[in-house]
């Protein structure tokens, strides 16, 4: 590729990263500084307080986003992919089984926190933009909630159609948004350049020394400036490290700093502007265009969050932490563009209830932060584990780095934990529900498979017996889904027991999820002939991939085992779960597992096998 083409490609990817990765953090100027002076903390709009908050915001953007995430955390990738579950997987590779269990729990807590915060993010972003109506026309105040719901309803409805065509507009719109942030801020800074003194960290330090405990509580508002910081790491696989870093340092960070300091300059000049300093930065003639642009930007930010939920859910499903569910690919070109109906509509219902219940973005701000800062603490611990165990960094440097990260993260988390009764219970409750679901599905599924393995018949002995004294053979190929490599599938046993026949060719198909986002086609399928009529096929997929039976058959044909979909019968085992006597808490967990199993996507639907080729055989299993 020529140098010119490389530059064009880098520019395109960097622009795309601006449109997707930075949507959430890019819309935080709508509400962050306003919330710092909300009645929760009791600060008057005085120069020293304005300087203190601006200094805190600036250095938080530098230390947490620029240093922690962009410089350190993004080094931890699995074949280019990032995210809290990826970090969890990396951290557990070279540790003891006990330590791995602890790290897995931490990773699942972090993932659960994400589900909790994701309900708040679209609501607070869109409501903050729509609240600009108050400035343009105060009489429209009663319509803020209905308008916010209408905008988000449209966003969730179009998810099933994919965002491929509309998504092309995301990057240009967000670029215009960031340039607008910069211009509005610069215009105000030029009028009051003394606000730039807040770049000096002494203002942040003096803010803490003067206001002591109250300033500590105010960290709960300052954290709003870094909403969506996890997206930088989670979306690394889509865009790559360098474009994400380039977009931050050349466009996003300068625009955010200029806008925050522009709002601060406005407050120094006119303290009354605290009612909505972002929209009051704009001249009167630009208010309506800014309102429209802000709404578009918050919709794009919400879209990025929704896409993030879909990606995290698919990863959790493929890693066995959530039950199988319908995943629809909305693009033939981009494997990352997916739609999960049950997640989409559950999230929509939760967001609408949050908007109706909290009514104002200021009320929602009181609920935000506790989960995201908890995830930040977990990320620091997991990253330092990877640095120590996987990369073998100097032990003393890793300990120093961990302490340095926690010195920032723990106070942030502690300050936000104080929001528990003012709204912080919401993301924690939602996160707790997801944590219970994920741990229940993983542990109960493991116990179920272990029980089936213990009571199963040996594969080798069974095949030898069948070849020695074969039952009646019928023409064609039979495929049996096999979870365990050395145990006869239940469906095969029941077919022999009730039908007393066997196909001329029997394929035992095992699907394996590797600890990687993708598996190369060369390593996709391995075939082993177990006897003249039995074959074992193991198909390997990464956790970002969706298994496809037609593709497996194609690879089998290339490896010398031709299979035709419409000439093959697929035998599936369907377990009817019976709950045995347990302690009450395990009994409840068992009930939840049974409910999840009943609503899980059947294997035939999961792998898109034609219904007329599927035969399901039921079996009762005690758990």
From Swiss-Prot:
The keyword Chloroplast does not apply. It catalyses: K(+)(in) + H(+)(in) = K(+)(out) + H(+)(out). InterPro entries: K+_transporter, K_trans_C, K_trans_N, Kup. GO terms for cellular component: plasma membrane. It is found in: Cell inner membrane. The keyword Cell membrane applies. It comes from the Bacteria. Keywords: Cell inner membrane, Cell membrane, Ion transport, Membrane, Potassium, Potassium transport, Symport, Transmembrane, Transmembrane helix, Transport. One of its GO terms (molecular function) is symporter activity. Its main location: membrane. It is a multi-pass membrane protein. The chain crosses the membrane at residues 10-30, 47-67, 102-122, 138-158, 166-186, 214-234, 248-268, 277-297, 338-358, 364-384, 396-416, 420-440. Responsible for the low-affinity transport of potassium into the cell. Likely operates as a K(+):H(+) symporter. Belongs to the HAK/KUP transporter (TC 2.A.72) family. This is Low affinity potassium transport system protein Kup. It comes from Yersinia enterocolitica serotype O:8 / biotype 1B (strain NCTC 13174 / 8081). The lineage of its organism: Bacteria, Pseudomonadati, Pseudomonadota, Gammaproteobacteria, Enterobacterales.
């Amino acid at each position: 590729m020529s140098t010119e083409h490389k530059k064009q490609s880098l520019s395109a990817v960097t622009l795309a990263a601006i449109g997707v990765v930075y949507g959430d953090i890019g819309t935080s100027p709508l509400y962050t500084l306003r919330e710092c002076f909300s009645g929760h903390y009791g600060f008057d709009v005085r120069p020293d307080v304005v300087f203190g908050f601006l200094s805190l915001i600036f250095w938080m953007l530098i230390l947490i986003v620029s240093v922690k995430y962009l410089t350190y955390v993004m080094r931890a990738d699995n074949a280019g992919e990032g995210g809290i579950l990826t970090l969890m997987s990396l951290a557990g590779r070279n540790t003891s089984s006990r330590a791995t269990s602890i790290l897995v729990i931490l990773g699942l807590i972090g993932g659960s926190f994400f589900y909790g915060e994701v309900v708040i993010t679209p609501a607070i972003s869109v409501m903050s933009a729509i609240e600009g109506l108050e400035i343009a026309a105060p009489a429209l105040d009663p319509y803020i909630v209905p308008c916010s719901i209408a905008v988000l309803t449209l966003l969730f409805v179009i998810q099933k159609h994919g965002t491929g065509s509309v998504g092309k507009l995301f990057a240009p719109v967000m670029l215009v948004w960031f340039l607008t942030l910069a211009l509005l801020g610069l215009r105000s800074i030029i009028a009051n350049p003394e606000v730039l003194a807040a770049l000096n960290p002494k203002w942040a330090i003096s803010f803490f020394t003067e206001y002591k405990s109250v300033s500590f509580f105010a960290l709960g508002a300052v954290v709003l400036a870094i909403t969506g910081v996890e997206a930088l790491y989670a979306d690394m696989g889509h865009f790559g490290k360098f474009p994400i870093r380039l977009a931050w340092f050349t466009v996003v960070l300068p625009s955010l700093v200029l806008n925050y300091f522009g709002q601060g300059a406005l407050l120094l000049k006119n303290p009354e502007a605290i009612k909505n300093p972002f929209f009051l930065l704009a001249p009167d003639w630009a208010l309506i265009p800014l309102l429209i642009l802000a709404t578009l930007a918050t919709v794009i930010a919400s879209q990025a969050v929704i896409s993030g939920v879909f990606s995290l859910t698919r990863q959790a499903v493929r890693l066995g932490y959530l039950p199988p569910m319908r995943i629809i690919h909305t693009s033939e070109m981009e494997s990352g563009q997916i739609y999960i109906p049950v997640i989409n509509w559950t999230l929509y219902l939760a967001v609408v209830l949050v908007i109706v219940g909290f009514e104002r973005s200021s009320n929602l701000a009181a609920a935000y932060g506790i989960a995201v800062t908890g995830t930040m603490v977990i990320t620091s611990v997991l990253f330092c584990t990877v640095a120590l165990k996987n990369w073998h960094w100097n032990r003393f440097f890793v300990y120093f780095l961990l302490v340095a990260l926690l010195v920032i993260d723990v106070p942030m988390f502690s300050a936000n934990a104080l929001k528990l009764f003012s709204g912080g219970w919401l993301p924690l409750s939602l996160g707790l529900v997801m944590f219970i679901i994920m741990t229940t599905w993983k542990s109960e599924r493991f116990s179920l498979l272990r029980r089936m393995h213990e009571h199963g018949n040996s594969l080798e002995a069974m095949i030898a017996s069948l070849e020695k004294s074969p039952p009646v053979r019928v023409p064609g190929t039979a495929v049996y889904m096999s979870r365990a490599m050395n145990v006869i599938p239940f469906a095969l046993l029941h077919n022999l027991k009730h039908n007393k026949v066997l196909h001329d060719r029997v394929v035992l198909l095992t699907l394996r999820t590797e600890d990687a986002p993708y598996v190369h086609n060369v390593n996709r399928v391995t075939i082993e002939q177990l006897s003249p009529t039995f074959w074992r096929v193991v198909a390997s997929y990464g956790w970002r991939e969706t298994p496809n039976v037609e593709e497996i058959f194609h690879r089998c044909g290339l490896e010398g085992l031709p299979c035709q979909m419409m000439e093959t019968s697929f035998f599936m085992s369907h377990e009817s779960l019976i709950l045995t006597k347990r302690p009450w808490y395990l009994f409840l967990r068992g009930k939840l597992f049974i409910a999840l199993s009943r609503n899980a996507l059947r294997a035939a639907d999961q792998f898109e096998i034609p219904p007329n080729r599927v035969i399901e055989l039921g079996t009762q299993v005690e758990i």
